[in-house]
């Protein structure tokens, strides 16, 4: 497992994941090796654990973490909340939105990132996630050679003062690294 800086295009640290272990146990070890203060740490859903999130914030950094079904009720609550608000174009809660449209190599992709920090209900319902400040949904539509696909991805963040544009850039930077 490695820590990659999208800004510097450089690997800052690496730890070996034991055959009898997984990334969840390696992530805290890797974080201990790094000075992450004032950074935004992005991870896929494997790293979306409340203890890892707390460790990042305790190190004076922030996170943008992919959220999937491995988080059970926490995921389900956020998914229902975001999908319901997306249906209403987030008209009933404070939010920011980032919209991008890209077309290259015969592919057209539209990505809308909706971010809200109006989540006090979530913090009360899931107190173990004490560092969470916002939730986001990425709503993507892709057309390739006339075939259209649609995808939604969920994210949580400790940033309470950033816009959807910032979160969208963090997510895109993460996927740029994943696709290297």
Which residue stretches match the model-derived regions?
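An anionic, glycine-rich sequence signature occurring as long contiguous blocks
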Residues: 68-172
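Phosphate- and divalent-cation-binding pockets in alpha/beta enzyme and binding domains
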Residues: 51-52, 73
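Short hydrophobic alpha-helical runs that function as membrane-insertion/retention elements
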Residues: 62-67
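Alpha-helical scaffold segments in soluble metabolic enzymes
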Residues: 29, 33, 55, 77, ...
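Solvent-exposed alpha-helices and their adjacent loops that cap or buttress functional pockets
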Residues: 4, 33-35, 55-58, 145-148
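Phosphate-centric recognition/catalysis
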Residues: 178
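Conserved, well-structured functional cores that handle cations and Mg-NTP chemistry
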Residues: 1-43, 48-51
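Short, surface-exposed basic-aromatic patches at helix termini and helix-loop junctions that form
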Residues: 53-61, 83
